[in-house]
Amino acid sequence: MRALLLLLILLGLPALAAETVNDVTGLNPIRVERVLAPTELQQIVAAVKNHPGPISIGGGRFSMGGQTATEGALQLDMRDFDQVLAFSAERREIRVQTGITWREILEYVDRYDLSPQIMQSYANFTVGGSLSVNVHGRYVGEGALIGSVRSIRLVLADGVLVDASPQHNSELFHGAIGGYGGLGVIVEATLGLAENSRIARESQVMPLSQYRAWFDREVRGHSDLVLHNGILYPDRFDKVRAVSYRRTDAALTETARLTPADRSYHLQKAGIRLTSASRTGRMLREAALDPLLFRGTQVQWRNHEASLDVRELEPIAGPDFSFVLQEYFVPPAQLERFVGELARLTGQHQANLINVSIRHAKADPGSLLAWAPQEVFALVLYYRQGSSVAERERAAAWTRDLIDAALACGGRYYLPYQIHASREQFLAAYPRAPEFFALKQRVDPAYKFRNRLWDTYLPPGADWPLAMPHRSL
């Protein structure tokens, strides 16, 4: 370690003393050996090549289960590695260092009337973090982020730089994206861009029983639609507010090209406080607050909607509570069945479920850890839980039951959140995990890249591929 520290000093790389890192929930304190904040590629290469122990990779720290750290690791804090490296308006692509946030990309490309092809709903995330979990957004006709990635550059465990794309080193490409930092450090990415068009919001409420047919008729295949999601209202789980954004030439009602960084989200925060307080609060949100939020005509730029801030969800954590996410993916034909199980299990476990957002994603057949090997509806759950041991155990039991329900529907669950799934559930949801583990064994035989996710399902010293029975859905 002394040799590494000397090297880092010579490279001018900040090396912070041992400290405890956490994520936005405050539920996962992890004591790491060092936190390094690189600003240059060579600093990352040197740190990876010369550090003898485990290495973890962190960005915005919006994952919720220790996916960015493990005990005693050297954590690479990528947030200062944030430059635009190349841009082509003609090819509609941008190459960036992966510590850059989507907000910074939006600020760069907006002047050219361009927008990210795919990103998540909030712009605070780093590109590297988004790639590592293979995010999705609300974009109509799109799916996982990997669908907009032209190429990536990785630093492997031996310090070697490797370029990967769907055509070149494709196994690394499909393993590293959605690979939760298990194969190497994604240091650069070339991303596709789209037109920054004016979009008009549309909203209507319907029974859940009608939503899927309505989606097939009014959303699927409509090239003039840019964004869509459904809001499913607890506790009855029988009504959906369908929210769509359609290209338009109408006059703007919101002239700002990006959401102001200091925007107030008081109505949204009031909704969270209201719905988390009681069943009556959830009913008031459905009957009064959301009709207020979605009233009237709204015409804005695509980039304005893309630049929303995660502050909308604050406070995410307090002294004895946290607001937490889960996400499940089911084939479209199984939507109503899964929602029925969601309603039953939420009541059975007395979970304080605040919001369910329904998204659609096309198939991602290539990723080794694909959450959508087929077309899916994604259901994003936002709930409040206590931070006591008993409350954590109750949330874990609810989560495992929901995972079983998703698996029974031919679906999967998402990995960036609290690590409650059993090993058997993980393998059932991700049947290509043995391929990922075999690839990791080839490119990281010393098991250098670690975090709590991989410590749980791929513990050090395991006979990696052989210890993981392949169980298909």
Language-model region placement:
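Structural signature of FAD isoalloxazine-binding scaffolds in flavoprotein oxidoreductases
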Residues: G65-L85, G137-G159, V185-G192, L379
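C-terminal substrate-binding/cap subdomain adjacent to the FAD-binding core in PCMH-type
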Residues: R150-R337, E341-R344, N352, H360
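Bacterial N-terminal signal peptides
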Residues: L4-P14
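Substrate-recognition/cap regions that form aromatic- and gly/pro-loop-enriched pockets
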Residues: W301-A428
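Short, acidic, Ser/Thr-enriched surface-loop or helix-capping motifs
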Residues: A89, T126, L156
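Activity-critical C-terminal alpha-helical subdomain
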Residues: E312, L407, G411-L473
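Glycine-rich N-terminal segment of FAD-binding domains in flavoprotein oxidoreductases
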Residues: L27-Q120, N134-Y139, I358
